[in-house]
Amino acid sequence: MESKIVYFDKPGGDANTSKTLSLAKKRAQELGIRTIVVASTVGKTAARAVGVFKGYKVIVVTHTTGFREPNTQEFTGENRKIVEDKGGIILTTTHALGGIHRSLGPSGGPPPPSLAMGDVIAMTLRMFGQGTKVACEIAAMAADAGLVRTDEEVISIGGTGRGADTALVLQPDYVHHFFNLRVKEIICKPRF
């Protein structure tokens, strides 16, 4: 099998988001994949994704409430309505690679002097880009929530900062079986 990978000159951003969603849809159509997992902080990327992926099962994974500020959910009510009205599913849950051990560190960061295993895994995935780490992590989070099957391929979309810049074809698995998750294809990612 031969497939094209698109590399972006810079991470994140609106232009990359449009291209990432377009490339992901094209590959989903080619492979017959009907489930899309997408990361979204405030909901802007999610609102765009449900528009692009009409007729698909779209699972949007958000930050936890309190991620940036106590008792605050960054995903806006306006974007939540757009996503839900278009049939999208919103999952708000703890980051798979940054759990309870983060409470030991300053400002919710890694606890000194050593890193927990989730941090090591996250940093390793970031060697391929922040979007790659995000796409793998949200797929596992969706599997834990029972929103995706572990025996079917999905397209998982992540990004760097704001917007989407990475799309992967992968077979998800649960967090407790994280190393069984399989990245089958890279559709696009930034070159850094």
What function would you assign to each model-found segment?
Residues 1-26:
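Glycine-rich phosphate-binding "P-loop"
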Residues 2-6, 56-118:
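Long, charge-dense
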Residues 9, 13, 35-39, 127, ...:
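Glycine- and other small-residue-rich loops at beta-strand/loop junctions that grip anionic moieties
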Residues 23-26, 48, 82, 123, ...:
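Alpha-helical scaffold segments in soluble metabolic enzymes
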Residues 26-76:
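N-terminal active-site beta-alpha-beta segment that forms phosphate/nucleotide-binding
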Residues 87-158, 163:
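Long, charge-patterned amphipathic alpha-helical coiled-coil/hairpin "stalk" segments used as oligomerization
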